[in-house]
């Protein structure tokens, strides 16, 4: 996994990293807005989300986080989200 992210880094270069991540955030944001307005396009939403996640992981690697740290934190967040979903946390009116 780390090798794949390093390839992405080499492809985009240091100067373009920020611009590429911002572009991917905008594409994900557009896809989220489309989901609310037009209904979900699961494939596009997944693709844009994964693009953003992979670039964020690249930044974490660049700043010295190792794979275990990142995966441990992701697992913690996923477990919390699943727990909240199963216990109706997201069903509450805000």
Language model region names:
Residues 1-94:
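Flexible "arm" and connector segments at domain edges
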């Amino acid at each position: 996994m780390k090798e794949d992210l390093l390839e992405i880094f080499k492809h985009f270069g240091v100067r373009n990293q920020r611009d590429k991540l911002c572009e991917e955030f905008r594409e994900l944001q557009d896809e989220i807005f489309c989901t609310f307005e037009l209904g979900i396009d699961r494939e596009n939403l997944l693709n844009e989300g994964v693009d953003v996640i992979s670039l964020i992981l690249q930044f974490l690697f660049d700043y010295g986080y190792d794979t275990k740290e990142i995966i441990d934190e992701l697992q913690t967040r996923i477990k919390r989200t699943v727990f909240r979903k199963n216990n109706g946390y997201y069903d509450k009116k805000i």
